[in-house]
């Protein structure tokens, strides 16, 4: 009995120690160091920062398409999962930044138009992946959850982005938006 308890304690200790390690491995930063630097450099420029998040999310989907079309790709299912996860993390960060700028009452109408266009593009690419007929079921099961989650998030967000743009247009008519976000880009072409 005592040996069994001792054994159980050791197993539990090992599981608890391994848990944070495996969790850290799953939640890596989807941004490269140069991308992090670019984001940091635009921290007070909503228009530029939001454009960067769209650009980075788009790059993950482009990389996904390239990887999936390459016949030499090894471990396609895992790479698909990881790129979709990176896309989801970047897209969530985009939405978090939108929320921040809305809370500050910044005028983000121009980047919202870009984001709405990107939403349509992202929806099409994610649906094409979901509807791909030539993918074995075993492969699909590896990334099906993250794909469904990403598609649901983009669908919901696209609707919210359109509503937010309408709200921003209305607020601009009543001059309720801060134009301070425009001062950094004043005189610069967009």
Task: Describe every region a protein language model picked out.
Residues 1-5:
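N-terminal secretory signal peptides that target proteins for export/translocation
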Residues 8-19:
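Bacterial N-terminal signal peptides
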């Amino acid at each position: 009995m005592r040996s069994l308890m001792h054994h159980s304690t050791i197993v539990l200790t090992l599981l608890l120690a391994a848990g944070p390690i495996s969790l850290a491995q799953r939640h890596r930063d989807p941004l490269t160091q140069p991308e992090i630097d670019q984001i940091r450099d635009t921290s007070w420029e909503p228009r530029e920062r939001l454009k960067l998040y769209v650009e980075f999310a788009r790059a993950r989907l482009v990389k996904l398409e390239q990887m999936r079309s390459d016949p030499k790709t090894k471990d396609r299912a895992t790479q698909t999962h990881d790129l979709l996860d990176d896309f989801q993390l970047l897209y969530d960060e985009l939405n978090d930044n939108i929320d921040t700028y809305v809370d500050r009452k910044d005028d983000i109408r121009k980047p919202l138009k870009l984001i709405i266009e990107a939403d349509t593009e992202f929806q099409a690419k994610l649906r094409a992946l979901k509807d791909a007929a030539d993918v074995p079921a075993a492969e699909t099961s590896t990334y099906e959850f993250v794909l469904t989650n990403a598609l649901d998030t983009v669908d919901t967000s696209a609707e919210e982005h359109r509503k937010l743009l309408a709200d921003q247009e209305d607020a601009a008519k009543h001059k309720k938006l801060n134009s301070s976000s425009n001062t950094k880009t004043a005189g610069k072409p967009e």
